[in-house]
Curated annotation (Swiss-Prot):
Pathway: Fermentation; pyruvate fermentation to lactate; (S)-lactate from pyruvate: step 1/1. One of its GO terms (molecular function) is L-lactate dehydrogenase activity. This is L-lactate dehydrogenase 3. SUPFAM superfamilies: LDH C-terminal domain-like (SSF56327), NAD(P)-binding Rossmann-fold domains (SSF51735). Belongs to the LDH/MDH superfamily. LDH family.
Amino acid sequence: MKINNKKVVIVGAGAVGSTYAHNLVVDDLADEIAIINTNKSKASANSLDLLHALPYLNAAPKNIYAADYSDVSDADIVVLSANAPSATFGKNPDRLQLLENKVEMIRDITRKTMDAGFDGIFLVASNPVDVLAQVVAEVSGLPKHRVIGTGTLLETSRMRQIVAEKLQINPKSIHGYVLAEHGKSSFAAWSNVTVGAIPLTTWLKKYPNPEFPTFDEIDQEIREVGLDIFMQKGNTSYGIAASLARLTRAIFRNESVILPVSAYLTGEYGQFDLYTGSPAIIDRTGVRAVLELELTQEEQEKFKASTVLLKENFDSIKEKCTL
């Protein structure tokens, strides 16, 4: 993909889409930002609000506007952050429960985008992101490396922050990844987590910390904290918007950086033909390569169990919805 004028189209002007648009402006990541929303007046208001921030930011002038699908043909990136109308999460929900109406929404958005002549990269943030990324890939017909879900970017950030707080270390010095589904079956690959260049397991033996929780406890906190945030403020937006911005920067700046995204597996971890969370090299082409971590037996079993769940849900959707 050749990128000259860096153009991003955001489909969905809710909390995530709006915060992501703000990140694009503040971080000076895009030259043109087009916002598509079912309520076009909200997209227009967001666009004006962002334009009014520009004079006080260290960013180049931008073209920011409310758009429709006729504006996507020359976009480099289309971000799907739209959410289907649904009941609130409720107590201890599963993202996969409200899947069918979300699949139909994402399918229709993808069709409209492709009918308009889009030939760039899709970034999928709508949940359940792994299943919906696969829907986008199948409906769009684009090469799989150009459809990327946010995957476990947010869980990985949460893991790094939690570990850093316990060790009183800058989270940028915590390295490792949360894998598999963006949801209840995700897990941190603790055998690969390091503090600097020191394995976390070695660090904890060398510098004992009686207040450091078990790995299972941290995994549980990572899985549950999103719901805690949602129940208190009605959404989660800053973390996932920052994750999207990080992906965007990697693409536009051709960084060849390793990020834990929802990527299409073609044999990695012994799995085929599905999207799930794994480290991948991200550059201007999208996913340049999916990386396979060396996992313990227990971690391999967790990964396999998660993929079984995702495959079951995607297969059930294919039976109910025409893709």
